[in-house]
C-alpha cells in the first residue's frame, strides 16, 4: 500500500484530477488532460517494479486517434484457421515468421499497411547497436547481446548487406581518457566485446574526415549497420517462400475472447480462427493486447526525425559517431580547444540522469550500408500513433547539433528526411512474454531502439514458446522442404563490369538503367515486384531496390517506375499509388492527353 500511495501522490502532483487504481496488479490511470506532456509525465510517475506495468488511459482533451485503415473490405481470409497468426509486419513480425517457417505450421502474418516494414522498421537509422547506453537488468539488454552476435549469419542467409562498422564516442577533452577504467568496466558488465580507446592517429585511419576537435575516441567494433527495410523484406519473402502466408492491407479490428482464450480475430478481410496469436503490432501493440484481454502496458509514441545526405558526402562517416551525452562541446570549439575544466563542462552538458530521462541515444552522424550519411534522430513525445510529419525547425536543429560531430556537413547536403515513431512503454523496456491473462497469445511489444538489433534473438524465444504451446496438442514436425537461404535481387551498382556484362546477357532488362542517381535497372525493378511478397507501389519498390532514393528523389525515374509497375500489374498508371491506397500519383489524363490517347 505504501508503494501505491507513493505513486498516487506522484501522479496527483502532476494532475490532481487523474484517477489512479490498482487493477490486476497494474497501475491504471484514467482521466482527461489538456496537455500531452502531462499525460506522459503521469505515465512515467506511475512506474514501479512492484507492479506488472502501467496502463495509462488518460485521454487528451479534443484529440481522437485516426487509424489509417486500408480501403479494401472483403472476405478473402474469412474462416481461415491458422496455427499461428502474427499481427504486424515489421522487423519483429517478419523475423518471427522467418523462424516459424522451419516447421510444418500454417502461419499467417497480417499487416494493416500496404507492405511490410512501413512503420518504425523503415523509419530508423539501421544501427545494430552495442548497448553502451543500456543497463544489465533490462530485458532488451539481454536480447541485444544475443541479437548483435546473430547478425553476420542472418544477413548472409538472407543475402542482405551488413557492415560491422563499429561505433565511436569521440573525445573533446583530455580528461575524457581518464574515464577509460570506468567505461571499460561498464562495457565488461554490459558484455560489449572489444571496446577500447583509440588516439587521434588511429581514429583518422578509421575516420579520415573526423572533426578536428576529436582527440581520440572510445571505439566499439561490434556495432554495425544494416538496411532495416531490406532485411525485413528479405525475411518476409523468405518466410513466404517457405510457406508462410503474408497478408497485406489486413487490419485487426477486434477479437472474441472466452475464458482467457482468443477464439477468433476479426479483420477487414474476414474472421480468422487462430490457435495462437503473436502480437508484434508496433505502436498499436497495447491496443491488440487490450483486445485480447492481456494488456499490462501502454505504448506512448515517441517521434524521431532522421536526415539523409547526398552520397557525395558519404566519406564523412564510415562508422556511427557521437559524443558522450553528458559532455558539452561548445559551438565555438575552434577557439576554446578543449580548455574548459571537468566541472564547468559537466555543468554545461546534460547530466547522466537528464540523459536517461530523455530516453534517446541523442542521435549521431551515421554511415549507412547504401553509402549515404544519416543524421539524427531527435525525440518528441506525440499523441498520434501514426505521426510521420516533419518540420523545418527540427531538421535545422538536428543539422546544427550534428555539425559539432562532423563540421563538414551542411543544409545544402540534405536530400531527404523522414519521421518514425518509437513504440515506447512507460517502463522503457520490451514486453516479450507469454500471455498472463490470455493463454494463447505471445506479446512482443514496446520494441523501440534497439529493436532492429534484438529482433533475431526475440524471434528465437517466441519460436520456442510457440512450439511449446502448439506441442501440447500434438508434436510439431520439421518443415522438410525448408530452404534456409534467400536470394535477394542483384544490385547492378555493386557489380564489376564483368559481372554486369554476364547478368545483362542473361537478362537484357538489367541493361536498361531507370534510376541514374542510384544506377537501378529495369531488371532489378521487375525482379523485385515478381518476388514472394509482390507489392505494386512506388515506395515498396524504392525500399527493395532504391529507385528514387538518390539526389533527385525520383524526379527523373519516378514516371518510368510507375509505367513499369502498371505494365507488370496489367493496370492503368492511374491505379499505381506511391504507398497506401490514399497516396494517389496520377488522378486522370489531361484533356489533350485523352484526345490523343497518350
Language-model-detected regions and their locations in the chain:
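Short beta-strand to alpha-helix junction loop
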Residues: 135, 140-145, 172-180, 218-237, ...
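Dinucleotide-binding Rossmann-like beta1-alpha1 core, especially the glycine-rich loop
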Residues: 126-206, 360-363
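Flavin-dependent oxidoreductases
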Residues: 255-261, 266-376, 380-389, 493
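N-terminal Rossmann-like FAD-binding beta1-loop-alpha1 element of flavoenzymes
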Residues: 79-109
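A conserved beta-strand/loop element that lines the FAD pocket in flavoprotein oxidoreductases
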Residues: 240-252
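Helix-loop-beta segment of a Rossmann-like dinucleotide-binding subdomain
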Residues: 25-26, 161-169, 204-242, 262-264, ...
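Glycine-rich FAD pyrophosphate-binding loop
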Residues: 102-123
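C-terminal catalytic lobe of FAD-dependent flavoproteins
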Residues: 2-7, 23-28, 32-33, 37, ...
Amino acid at each position: 500500500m505504501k508503494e501505491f500511495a507513493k505513486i498516487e501522490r506522484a501522479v496527483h502532483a502532476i494532475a490532481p484530477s487523474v484517477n489512479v487504481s490498482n487493477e490486476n496488479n497494474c497501475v491504471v490511470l484514467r482521466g482527461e488532460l489538456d496537455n500531452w506532456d502531462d499525460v506522459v509525465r503521469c505515465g512515467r510517475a506511475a512506474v514501479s517494479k512492484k507492479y506488472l506495468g502501467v496502463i495509462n488511459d488518460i485521454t487528451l482533451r479534443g484529440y481522437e486517434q485516426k487509424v489509417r485503415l486500408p480501403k479494401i473490405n472483403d472476405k478473402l481470409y474469412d474462416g481461415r484457421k491458422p496455427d499461428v497468426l502474427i499481427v504486424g509486419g515489421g522487423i519483429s513480425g517478419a523475423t518471427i515468421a522467418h523462424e516459424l517457417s522451419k516447421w510444418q505450421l500454417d502461419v499467417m502474418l497480417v499487416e494493416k499497411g500496404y507492405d511490410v516494414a512501413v512503420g518504425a522498421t523503415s523509419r530508423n537509422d539501421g544501427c545494430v547497436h552495442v548497448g553502451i547506453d543500456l543497463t544489465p537488468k533490462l530485458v532488451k539488454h539481454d536480447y541485444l547481446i544475443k541479437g548483435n552476435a546473430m547478425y553476420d549469419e542472418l544477413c548472409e542467409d538472407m543475402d542482405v548487406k551488413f557492415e560491422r562498422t563499429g561505433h565511436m564516442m569521440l573525445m573533446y577533452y583530455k580528461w575524457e581518457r581518464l574515464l577509460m577504467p570506468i567505461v571499460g568496466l561498464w562495457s565488461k558488465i554490459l558484455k560489449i566485446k572489444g571496446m577500447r580507446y583509440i588516439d587521434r592517429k588511429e581514429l583518422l585511419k578509421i575516420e579520415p574526415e573526423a572533426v578536428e576537435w576529436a582527440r581520440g575516441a572510445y571505439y566499439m567494433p561490434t556495432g554495425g549497420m544494416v538496411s532495416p527495410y531490406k532485411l525485413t523484406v528479405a525475411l518476409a519473402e523468405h518466410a513466404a517462400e517457405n510457406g508462410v502466408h503474408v497478408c497485406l492491407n489486413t487490419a485487426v479490428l477486434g477479437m472474441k475472447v472466452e475464458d482467457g482464450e482468443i477464439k477468433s480475430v476479426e479483420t477487414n478481410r474476414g474472421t480468422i480462427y487462430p490457435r495462437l496469436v503473436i502480437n508484434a503490432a508496433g505502436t498499436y501493440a497495447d491496443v491488440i493486447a487490450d483486445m485480447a484481454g492481456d494488456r499490462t502496458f501502454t505504448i506512448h509514441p515517441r517521434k524521431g526525425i532522421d536526415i539523409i545526405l547526398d552520397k557525395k558526402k558519404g566519406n564523412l562517416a564510415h562508422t556511427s559517431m557521437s559524443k558522450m551525452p553528458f559532455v558539452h562541446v561548445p559551438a565555438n570549439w575552434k577557439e576554446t580547444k578543449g580548455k574548459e575544466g571537468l566541472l564547468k563542462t559537466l555543468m554545461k552538458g546534460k547530466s547522466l540522469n537528464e540523459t536517461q530521462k530523455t530516453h534517446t541515444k541523442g542521435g549521431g552522424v551515421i554511415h549507412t550500408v547504401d553509402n549515404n550519411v544519416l543524421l539524427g534522430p531527435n525525440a518528441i513525445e506525440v499523441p498520434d500513433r501514426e505521426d510521420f510529419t516533419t518540420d523545418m525547425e527540427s531538421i535545422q536543429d538536428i543539422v546544427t547539433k550534428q555539425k559539432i560531430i562532423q563540421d563538414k556537413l551542411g543544409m545544402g547536403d540534405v536530400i531527404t528526411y523522414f519521421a518514425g515513431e518509437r513504440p515506447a512503454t512507460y517502463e522503457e523496456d520490451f514486453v516479450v512474454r507469454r500471455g498472463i491473462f490470455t493463454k494463447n497469445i505471445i506479446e512482443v511489444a514496446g520494441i523501440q531502439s534497439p529493436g532492429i538489433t534484438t529482433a533475431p534473438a526475440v524471434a528465437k524465444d517466441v519460436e520456442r514458446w510457440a512450439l511449446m504451446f502448439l506441442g501440447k496438442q500434438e508434436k510439431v514436425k520439421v518443415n522438410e522442404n525448408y530452404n534456409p537461404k534467400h536470394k535477394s535481387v542483384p544490385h547492378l551498382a555493386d557489380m564489376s563490369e564483368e559481372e554486369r556484362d554476364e547478368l545483362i546477357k542473361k537478362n537484357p532488362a538489367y541493361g536498361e538503367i531507370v534510376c541514374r542517381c542510384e544506377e537501378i535497372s529495369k531488371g532489378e525493378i521487375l525482379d523485385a515486384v515478381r518476388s514472394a511478397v509482390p507489392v505494386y507501389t512506388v515506395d515498396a519498390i524504392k525500399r527493395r531496390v532504391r529507385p528514387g532514393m538518390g539526389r533527385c528523389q525520383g524526379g527523373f525515374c519516378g514516371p518510368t517506375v510507375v509505367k513499369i509497375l502498371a505494365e507488370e500489374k496489367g493496370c492503368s498508371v492511374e491505379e499505381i499509388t506511391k504507398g497506401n491506397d490514399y497516396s494517389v500519383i496520377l488522378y486522370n489524363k489531361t484533356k489533350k492527353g485523352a484526345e490523343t490517347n497518350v
